[in-house]
Amino acid sequence: MNITELNGRPLRLLIGGSPCTYWSIAQKNNRETEAEGLGWELFKNYLIAKEKFNPDLFLYENNKSASQAIKDQIVHELGYPLQVIDSALVSAQKRLRFYVKNWECPLPEDRGILLKDILELSESVVEKEKAYCLCTDHVWTTRDYFKKHQSQIVFEPVRIGDIGSNSQAHRVYSCYGKSVNLVANGGGQGAKTGLYFVPLPEELEKLVCDKGKIYKVENHTIPTKFGDFNVNLPDGLYIIRKLTVTEAARLQTMPDNYMKSVSAQQGYKGLGNGWTAEVIIHQLKYGLKDIPKDYPIEVLSMYDGIGTGRYCLDKMGYTNVTYKAYEIDKYAMTVANDNYPDIIQCGDAFQLREDDWAY
């Protein structure tokens, strides 16, 4: 965007992604595959916003799994090609989304971020390099992970006890066990005093600790009530847990405490419905590359969710932003305004169809 084309008026930016519930391949019943139905009506609100708001720049996002017929019609309506970007390039999550925008930008370079890089606990491990796509459903189960290849779980080596104190060097784990533990002798840190192998108590297998059931990995196989599964983990004892809200935020490249104003359940949901921030930032950098950081920007955000668009502009350093958002989920709005009180909440996106609508 060339700033001289604006003649001193604020730059107008339209962003949004209509809810993908009706189009996603994850929709088991009554999935919409043609450019009609409620899913298409939600998209039409974005089209109406584009017509009435008359933005200088616009960015639209949705799930890659939408049918080709729907994607083709979106391209026809918006007049620009779609670009598929996998969030795995800039995060630890596999998340395929398509974007349509009225400027060009290349794919992001692969930053080499792995799932293990975003875990809160250093002793936690994962067997895959990238997480499955974050979804809105917070009830993630071991069965979903192993049998459906959905959700994401984390393996924590079982902590057996302490030797002498609770300091990090004296904790006993079955980290890379092969039926043994590492323990630290007294007199200082394990690195200084030496480590000794002791037999791993077999009676711990199949017991339940304070964090859940204990699983034994042997020969890269983990037995569960759903069957035996191959895992890329060293032999040893593990408990299985889901990602924390902080880890889920990191998958979406959002700040650790961004969801602090709502429950964990709503935190997972809001993040699952949201954007991968660094993917949006990468694209906006090209659209706004010639715009000074203090230049006035008027944003219209459709289906705003947790305010990721506002966060992106803030992280990019833009300081003169008017941000109006259409959203109806009260928890998402709570998160958005907790982080950015300047977001102006406008309510239901269908209000844009009113004859007297104005920004």
Regions from the language model: what does each represent?
Residues 1-359:
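Conserved active-site and SAM-binding loop architecture
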